[in-house]
Amino acid sequence: MRSDKKIDSQGKPVDDDEILIRLLCSPLQYDKETKQVSIDAFDLRMMGKNHDNLEHFASLGRKVAIEDEDEFQEYLQKGYSIWNDKEWEENEYYGYGTFRCKDALATNDMVEIHPLTGAAQHIGMYYAKNEDEYYKGPLPKENLEVFEMLSDLADLINDTVVVAPARS
């Protein structure tokens, strides 16, 4: 059985019709010129100074847990803490795409969405590697099934992307 210490097994399951948010905070994730979401938008990252911390899940926002427009704008600004200053000098925007939980789950059997411990506004999108474990970043895009899954997830939000100017 797959498990992750951040999954809140006691938390309320995510409703099939719940609207989820994926922040798009980098040209690696969304091309403003072509208006295309990249497959990297749902990939798992390597983080840390030496890229030794591998992401276990893609963090998604829960629209239902964001109470008003001010809180929503504050949530959108979280993308700035994801990328370091050097990368932000090249960014001109932040953006996000929305989708229903059940639509993401329908893209591939590997996709699982779970509530996270201590995180009301966030949930985790996990990718099942086998019956015992989840993938850790980055995903093996040379695997056709993984590539198609990421492509389907990108297509899922492509028509819902909202782009706003970066903070000044």
Language model segments and positions:
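Compositionally biased, intrinsically disordered low-complexity segments
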Residues: 10, 24, 40-42, 79, ...
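Intrinsic-disorder/low-complexity loop/linker signature
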Residues: 11, 34-35, 86, 118, ...
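Short linear sequence motifs
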Residues: 13-16, 23, 35, 68, ...
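Weak global preference for isoleucine
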Residues: 7, 19-21, 39, 66, ...
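Active-site or metal-binding loop neighborhoods of secreted/extracellular toxin and effector enzymes
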Residues: 103-168
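ADP-ribose/NAD+-binding catalytic cleft of ART/PARP-like enzymes
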Residues: 1-58
